[in-house]
């Protein structure tokens, strides 16, 4: 029995270590097993974003503007003074900086349920402590870019109750014979923003510009509870390579691996629960770039060439900008593969069906907490035959534990004879000491997947359960669920045979305390899942053990 228990604890410990190490590497931190080489802060702005040299004049003309923070360069100040234009819709409050017509602040608005504060979250921001921007401009000459001050076109800045769309337009100064009119279109109930760039050639010669669309962000986490970390950083999606995550650490070391040109897909910045993504028109060729532009500032973007524009003519480049929560069903309807920004890691193949099932149950019961309870119950029912096999093996081992202890005491000075005697006992009683391991091991990927489902699902944010639980994404405010978790673990240890080794027995008694401390900081939805799982496991074990005990008693009586 102690061998099987040791194997299970080793499996559990290694799973926990590997999950933690995977989280470390996903956030650009050093791996415990693979030391990082010395990081560099070089990110040449003379490159074209995919590692090619910008030595030629054409490449220099297409080099991205080098203002690292999104503010104006520290050189000659422009004649016009930039200002922030505030706007509001039913889902956004935000600010557009007239310097570049940049989307400099974007707050996703959502009201609370009266028992907690509003659930609004600021996605884009530009402060001394945090930078996250969406910006565009022109390349290919001395054309308007995100450093130039635009003029706001007169018009409403709030979505009226009787309107479905709000348009905000900004005009650039004339540079290189080109004027740009940038228009943001906000739609009621939508987290997709239309961004139209109208390029007017007001000069005397044809121009061939390129439009760049980029997301600029620092590497700081925002609104990330303890032990609730998921991927943070840029991502690229194309039909060729599908979803490619890029860690800030890989960018630091110039090891970022991604598709550098395509005519489909999107680029994104991903964080816990929320994401932003530029989605150019499908079929339009574009170059993709990911760069470090400051010690803590990064950008991911696309450069889309525009056909030659004759004097007096204009060209329009349309794109969509998603900025919102990582709700799978909504993301699936916006762009192919966009739902992948909701990151389940290496268990995606199992996690996605589990979330689908959780979502269906929620649609039936209308409460995410009860949906977690019912899904856990359903999973335990599916795995009942495997659990029964494990508990039966444990029960049989419990029956022969006194005889095992006697053999250990008898042959304690001769380990070889002791092992031979134990093997003979197992053979005589037809007991496999590892018989309970395999059923448990098979279930581990499912339980890890459900962990990631609950961790990554923005639906848990602000979702109440009962009584004191008003937000399943936050820790239990009164620590009731962690205490119940500790109690359930303690009961489980009592149901199992006491290990013959006193040190191991003390460890088994200590584990509930150690794990309960860790669970004090877990989101309530995760702890609820573990509590329900433990309670159901206790009920299963008690039922199976009692059934076997009754059968054994009848056999002896006969």
Swiss-Prot record:
One of its GO terms (biological process) is protein insertion into membrane. GO terms for cellular component: plasma membrane. The chain crosses the membrane at residues 3-23, 364-384, 438-458, 477-497, 508-528. It is a multi-pass membrane protein. Its main location: membrane. Keywords: Cell inner membrane, Cell membrane, Chaperone, Membrane, Protein transport, Transmembrane, Transmembrane helix, Transport. GO terms for molecular function: membrane insertase activity. It is found in: Cell inner membrane. Pfam families: 60KD_IMP, YidC_periplas. Required for the insertion and/or proper folding and/or complex formation of integral membrane proteins into the membrane. Involved in integration of membrane proteins that insert both dependently and independently of the Sec translocase complex, as well as at least some lipoproteins. Aids folding of multispanning membrane proteins. Interacts with the Sec translocase complex via SecD. Specifically interacts with transmembrane segments of nascent integral membrane proteins during membrane integration. Belongs to the OXA1/ALB3/YidC family. Type 1 subfamily. This is Membrane protein insertase YidC. The gene is yidC.
């Amino acid at each position: 029995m102690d061998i099987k228990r040791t194997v299970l604890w080793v499996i559990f410990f290694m799973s926990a270590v590997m999950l933690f190490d995977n989280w470390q590497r996903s956030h650009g931190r050093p791996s415990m097993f693979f030391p990082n080489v010395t990081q560099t802060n070089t990110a040449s702005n003379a490159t074209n974003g995919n590692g090619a040299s910008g030595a030629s004049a054409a490449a220099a003309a297409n080099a991205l503007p080098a203002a690292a923070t999104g503010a104006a360069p520290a050189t000659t100040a422009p004649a016009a003074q930039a200002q922030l234009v505030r706007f509001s819709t039913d889902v956004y409050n935000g600010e557009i900086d007239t310097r570049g017509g940049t989307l400099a602040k974007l707050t996703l608005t959502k009201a609370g349920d009266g028992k907690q504060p509003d659930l609004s979250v600021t996605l884009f921001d530009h402060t001394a402590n945090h930078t996250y921007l969406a910006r565009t401009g022109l390349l290919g000459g001395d054309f308007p870019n995100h450093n130039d001050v635009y003029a706001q076109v007169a018009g409403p800045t709030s979505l009226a109750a009787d309107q479905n769309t709000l348009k905000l337009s900004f005009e650039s100064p004339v540079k290189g014979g080109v004027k740009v009119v940038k228009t943001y279109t906000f739609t009621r109930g939508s987290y997709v923003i239309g961004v139209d760039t109208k390029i007017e050639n007001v000069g005397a010669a044809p121009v061939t510009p390129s439009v760049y669309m980029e997301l600029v962000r620092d590497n700081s986490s925002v609104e990330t509870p303890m032990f609730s970390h998921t991927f943070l950083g840029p991502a690229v999606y194309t039909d060729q390579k599908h979803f490619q995550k890029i860690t800030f650490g890989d960018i630091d070391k110039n090891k970022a691996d991604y598709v550098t040109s395509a005519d489909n897909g999107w680029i994104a910045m991903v964080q816990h629960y929320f994401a932003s993504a530029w989605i150019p028109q499908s079929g339009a060729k574009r170059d993709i770039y990911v760069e470090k532009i400051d010690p803590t500032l990064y950008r991911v973007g696309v450069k889309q060439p525009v056909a030659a524009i004759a004097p007096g003519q204009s060209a329009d480049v349309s794109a969509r900008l998603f900025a919102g929560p990582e709700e799978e069903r909504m993301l699936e309807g916006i762009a192919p593969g966009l739902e992948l920004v909701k990151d389940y890691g290496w268990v995606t193949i199992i996690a996605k069906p589990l979330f689908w099932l959780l979502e269906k149950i929620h649609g039936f019961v209308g409460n995410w907490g009860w949906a977690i309870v019912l899904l856990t119950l359903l999973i335990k029912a599916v795995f009942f035959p495997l659990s029964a096999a494990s508990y039966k093996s444990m029960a049989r081992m419990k029956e022969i534990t006194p005889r095992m202890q006697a053999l250990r005491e008898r042959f304690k000075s001769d380990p070889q004879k002791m092992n031979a005697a134990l093997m003979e006992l197992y053979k005589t009683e037809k007991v496999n000491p590892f018989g309970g391991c395999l059923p448990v091991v098979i279930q581990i990927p499912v339980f890890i997947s459900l962990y990631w489902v609950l961790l990554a699902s923005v639906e848990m944010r602000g979702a109440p359960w009962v009584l004191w639980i008003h937000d399943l994404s936050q820790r239990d405010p009164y620590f009731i669920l962690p205490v119940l978790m500790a109690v359930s673990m303690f009961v489980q240890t009592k149901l199992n045979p006491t290990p013959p080794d006193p040190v191991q027995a003390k460890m088994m008694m200590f584990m509930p305390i150690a794990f309960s401390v860790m669970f004090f900081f877990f989101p309530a939805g995760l702890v609820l899942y573990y509590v329900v799982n433990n309670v159901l496991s206790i009920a299963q074990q008690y039922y199976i053990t009692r059934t076997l005990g009754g059968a054994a008693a009848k056999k002896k009586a006969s």
